[in-house]
Design a protein with these regions (language model features):
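Low-acidity, Ser/Thr- and Arg-rich intrinsically disordered low-complexity segments
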Residues: 2-4, 9-11, 20
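Enzymes that bind and transform nitrogen-containing heteroaromatic metabolites
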Residues: 22-221
Length: 221
């Protein structure tokens, strides 16, 4: 007669196996859900508006506080190369114009990012800015109409840059995806990722980028 495990205890191998099965199922479920979303978007013939920024553990964004690792910077280069364009508020656009001019201290990857950024069409939402750089257009009036037309006429992914602009577009129901690049840093103060009330969201995927950054991808619920 063979011995059996005591009542109330499972065999030592059952828990790891069960955990592996659950993790595998979750990964498969996320992959299927993401694939379905991609098929719908591909068939819609409309651009996808994406808001992504680096964020601290306590919810703040500050481009001066997050020096990207080599892996993360390469990721941003690939993102910029693949995007159909970017929509900026005035202040964020002025910050990003740093990439319009070459700098002698740049390495090859910084040159690669600058090239990708310059090649992108850019739309600057501002009633006051009259000076814009190459490959950029002003959006001065009717933000909702302009962005809806932009999404209808373009294919691919269009980046939204800056939490204030993202707040306005969120309130209009125009952002299709939110990407939070979560860093193991606590700032204690600053500009929050969500400049207004957080909209209802559904988590779609999580990715680890490099050693210490987790990307959380959400869509409107």
């Amino acid at each position: 007669m063979s011995e059996s495990a005591p009542v109330g205890r499972s065999c030592p191998t059952q828990k790891p196996i069960a955990t592996s099965v659950i993790l595998a199922y979750n990964r498969l479920h996320n992959a299927i859900r993401t694939a379905r979303m991609c098929r719908v978007r591909k068939g819609s013939g409309m651009a996808k508006l994406v808001f992504g920024m680096n964020q601290s553990l306590d919810g703040y964004v500050d481009h001066m506080a997050f020096a990207p690792s080599t892996t993360l910077f390469r990721h941003f280069i690939e993102e910029a190369q693949g995007q159909a364009g970017s929509v900026y508020g005035r202040r964020m656009y002025e910050v990003m114009r740093y990439w319009d001019d070459d700098h002698p201290e740049w390495d090859a990857e910084e040159h690669a990012f600058a090239t990708a950024w310059r090649n992108q069409p850019k739309w600057v939402v501002s009633r006051w800015s009259k000076s814009i750089g190459p490959n950029a257009s002003l959006v001065e009036d009717d933000l909702e109409g302009a962005i809806r037309e932009l999404k209808a006429k373009r294919d691919g992914e269009i980046e939204v840059a800056g939490p204030d602009l993202a707040r306005s577009l969120t309130e209009l129901g125009l952002i299709d995806e939110y990407r939070i690049y979560l860093h193991p840093v606590v700032l204690g103060h600053g500009k929050p990722y969500f400049a207004g009330p957080r909209p209802p969201l559904r988590l779609m995927t999580t990715d680890r980028i490099g050693e210490d950054v987790i990307r959380l991808t959400y869509v409107p619920a």
